[in-house]
Design a protein with these regions (language model features):
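Rossmann-fold dinucleotide-binding core
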Residues: 80-159
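Rossmann-fold NAD(P) dinucleotide-binding segment
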Residues: 37-100
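Short secondary-structure transition/capping segments
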Residues: 27-28, 46-48, 62, 112-115, ...
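Active-site-adjacent beta-strand anchor residues
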Residues: 16, 50, 78, 120-121
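Active-site loop signature of alpha/beta-hydrolase-fold enzymes
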Residues: 21, 56, 107
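NAD(P)+-binding Rossmann beta1-loop-alpha1 motif at the extreme N-terminus of oxidoreductases
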Residues: 1-49, 72
Length: 159
């Protein structure tokens, strides 16, 4: 996903991970690499998050939130509990930061090929801004409703 954003979006992509292997791949692809969540928050207008669970998502958001400012956007691709998604969105919204849940479906190969399916929960204006970025790694993008709706549809998709 990160590689496709880098090669297709026309924007500067800055990666952050606690695992050095993905950062080595990012450097090899001439992407920027951040040293901390604070660096990400201070240097990125749109922040994409992809975590294995809601627990890690909460930790990442707790690390980002103090450093983010009004006008930025979070695009969360994690499959996370709906209640957590809505809670995080409300916390960011209180700071003037937009939040979209955009969980992904399909395979690792689909991620490489840019053919993922993405179910988005966001305000329409936020969706209009982020959809061209999501299209860098997905070819099946659906606005499902407000924040949390992407998670609901992803859960139904997994049943």
């Amino acid at each position: 996903m990160c590689h496709n954003l880098h090669t297709k979006s026309g924007r500067t992509v800055i990666a952050y991970d606690i695992d050095p292997a993905p950062l080595d791949r990012a450097r090899a692809a001439n992407m920027g690499v951040a040293d901390s969540l604070e660096d990400i928050a201070k240097n990125c207008g749109t922040v994409f998050i992809s975590m294995p669970s809601g627990v890690q998502l909460q930790l990442i958001c707790d690390g980002l939130m103090p450093h983010m400012t009004s006008g930025q956007t979070i695009v969360d691709t994690t499959t996370a509990p709906v209640a957590l998604t809505k809670e995080l969105a409300a916390q960011f919204k209180a700071k003037g930061i937009d939040y979209a849940d955009a969980p992904i479906a399909r395979t690792r190969q689909a991620a490489r090929d840019g053919t993922l399916a993405v179910m988005v929960g966001a305000e329409e204006a936020v969706f209009a801004r982020i959809e061209p970025l999501i299209a860098c790694y997905a070819n099946d993008i659906t606005l499902c409703g407000g924040v949390g709706s992407g998670q609901v549809v992803k859960i139904l998709n997994n049943m």
